[in-house]
Amino acid sequence: MEKVYINRANILTPFGNSIQANWNELVKGNSAVYKIDSFGHLKNFYAGKIDDEIFLNLKGQVEDNQIYTRLELFGILALQSIIDKSKISKRTAFVISTTKGNIDQLSDSLEKASITNFAKKIANYFRFKTEPIIISNACVSGVLAVNIAKRFIEMDEFDDAYVLALDELTNFVLTGFN
């Protein structure tokens, strides 16, 4: 069995949309976790949140950005720099990990809140030729997604894979920590 390696990665946080931008801030001793006075029903807690100003600056980098939710745009932006340098074939897997996807859309539309629809919108943006593989198992989903992608490649189901792990600060997610 051939070894499987991670050969490209990216990270999108309040520090920026690259590993280097995040590393530079960490080396300086900076933290993206800060006190949030109020968010939904919660008051005075600490979390990492991508502010609206940063989001609006990033949003302009995505074509037809008005048809995507905030979380879908985060997923597209995080993947864009590594997919732009690659080819997606019918043997390329797309594994997406999220706790609840677009759960904040539930009050507007069941369809928008569907994790399946959420994953398909991101997959369609990049023209993946396979159905997205969805892993939804709370905080450990990202590690499971990497493991599953690795196993699919080892089993010769796919030649390569893109793994996207993402969640957003929402009332639902915060309630789980309360």
Question: Where are the model-predicted features located?
Answer:
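Short, well-ordered, mixed-charge alpha-helical segments that flank or form enzyme active sites
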Residues: 102-106, 141-144, 168-173
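Solvent-exposed, non-transmembrane amphipathic alpha-helical segments
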Residues: 42-46, 142, 178
